[in-house]
Amino acid sequence: MHQPILVAALLLVSLVLENRRKERRFDIIEKLKKQFEIKRVIDLSYFEKESVFLEGTGSMILDRQNKICYAALSDRTNLIALNDFCNRALYNPVTFKSYQKVEGKINLIYHTNVMMCIADQYAIVCLETIHNTKEREVLISSLEKTNKEII
C-alpha cells in the first residue's frame, strides 16, 4: 500500500467571475484528500459574498523560501483577503499598486503575475508600473534582503 504524499495546505480562493467559481468542485477536493495527506484547508471563498477577492496565483507571487507574499492590490487582489491568507499561511505581505495604460486610461494591473515573477535567485519585476516611490522601494528592499537579483 502506498503512502499519501504530504501536502501542507489546500487553498480555496475567492474569484470575481461566476463561471470560474463553478470550477471549484468539492468532489475533486474530496478525491485529493484521499490521495494526499492534506494538513489543512484554507478556504477564502466566503469572501465572494462580500465582493472581496483574492484570485490565487494570479494575485499573489509567493516566495515560499522566505515566506513572503508579493501582491499588486486591485479589485481582484483585496488587502483584507490577502492579510487573511498571510495570517493563516504565515506569510509576510509586501503590497503595492501597479498600473498599466490601456486605451489611453491608467488602470490598476489586476494580477500581480502580469508584472512580476520570482525564482530561487532572482525576481523579474516591471518596477516602472509601481508609481508610488515608497511602495517601489519597499519591494526592492524586500527582494534585496532575500538576495534576489532584480531583473
Model-identified regions with their sequence ranges:
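The feature marks the mature, well-folded catalytic cores of soluble enzymes
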Residues: M1-I151
